[in-house]
Amino acid sequence: MGQKVNPNGLRLGINRNWESRWVAKDNRQTALWLVQDDKIRKHIFKVCKAAQVSHVEIERTQNKVDIFIHCSQPGIVLGKEMSNLKVLKQQLSYIVGRKTKVNVNVLPLDKPTFSARIIAREIADAIENRFSFRNAQKIAIKKVLASGAKGIKTNVSGRLGGVEMAREEGYSEGIVPLTTLRANIDYALEEAWTTYGLIGVKVWINRGELFKKNFSQNTKFEKKPIEKKREQQPVQQQKPQQPKPQPKVVKEVKQEEPAKPVKAESLKREQEVLKVVEAKPAEGAKKGKVEETAIIMISTKKEYADNLLNEDLNKNVFFYKVTPVNPIKRVLIYTTTGKKGVVGEFDLDKIEILAVSTAWRKYGQQSCMSKKDFDEYYKDSEKAHILISKEAFRYSRPKTLESYNMKKGPSGFQYLK
């Protein structure tokens, strides 16, 4: 009988990487590290259940463990002033041993609905809360397809609805080619604990194809006749012939395609993004302009600006690293107003000290705040410290600070376009 293989294991080394990456000394250390990795993952999925963890990657050396937690709500894992992250590090150090250094990196997901584990966990939670298993699957399927997935397949099995005989039921929409190795398919299995028994939830999500086809199945190959080998004749000396003049090759000039018309709204948006902000250069620096990559922030107190220069980030901002595949110097969550925040990278270049009124007159046109909010925020301050960056990139749209588990902005930094 044909059986369905795990799509994650089938694609390892083709379009998917191992989630545990290390090299052990001997068989004894291999067994020890395998058990530790399993305990680490089970503990993280249990403690960080509210953060919707998709998967956990582990990289090891002999004296260090790097753990990368991919989740949809990183603020819950980090906690207020990194309190939850410190507790999690301490708990994980008991698993791997105190002599081994533990580094925990929290990474946000671009599209949480593309994660099969998150969707399977949502269906399992709905079943545990006595929600209809059919409606739970249909809602999850609509959510995944609306986010741009190519297809999804769900399956629940057990005593569905509390009946005496166990059975299984599932739904499928879109394209889910399990045997096509170039298809990026994510698979997860979760369990729903109910009063009448255990119910298993399986989810397959097709994110799209990673490689294109080189040729179609209908391609026809022409058969060429095999030429017989001719007998070699003795070489006769011939007079050298003069090379014939070759005709000049005239290249055809391709006609350029007419440019597509650009909408006025998109053009205006591009101009705003690529806006050049004039800034006062530091002493001894060359005169020039700070481009849009130089994002500017204004601080109410000098100590907050000094903390950024000294890289004492724990006192004023929340931050987390990213994977070594996409190295980033500093990823922060900084405020756009007193109620919203943005995830992004900020590499500080210099600080310019101005009066509050001068700071608004010089940089207020690029601010996301209104003049009323600006005056209310800086009413007790005389000077403002303008932080100008070398490079800065925004990785999310402005969100409420509650989604980052924050009630106040990190030390009063304000984001300016």
From Swiss-Prot:
PROSITE patterns (alphabetical): KH_TYPE_2 (PS50823)
Keyword Nucleotide-binding applies: no
HAMAP family the UniProt entry points to: Ribosomal_uS3_B
Pfam families registered for this protein in UniProt: KH_2, Ribosomal_S3_C
Annotated region (Disordered), positions in chain: 221-264
Lineage: Bacteria, Bacillati, Mycoplasmatota, Mycoplasmoidales, Mycoplasmoidaceae
KH type-2 domain residues: 40-110
Assembly description: Part of the 30S ribosomal subunit. Forms a tight complex with proteins S10 and S14.
Gene Ontology CC: cytosolic small ribosomal subunit
Listed NCBIfam families: rpsC_bact (TIGR01009)
Signal peptide: none
Biological role: Binds the lower part of the 30S subunit head. Binds mRNA in the 70S ribosome, positioning it for translation.
One BP term from GO: translation
Record protein name field: Small ribosomal subunit protein uS3
GO terms for MF: mRNA binding; rRNA binding; structural constituent of ribosome
Gene3D superfamilies referenced in this protein's UniProt entry, alphabetically: 3.30.300.20, Hypothetical protein, Ribosomal protein S3, C-terminal domain
Biased composition (Basic and acidic residues): 221-232, 249-264
Region of interest called Insert, as start-end residue ranges on this chain: 250-417
Coiled coil: none
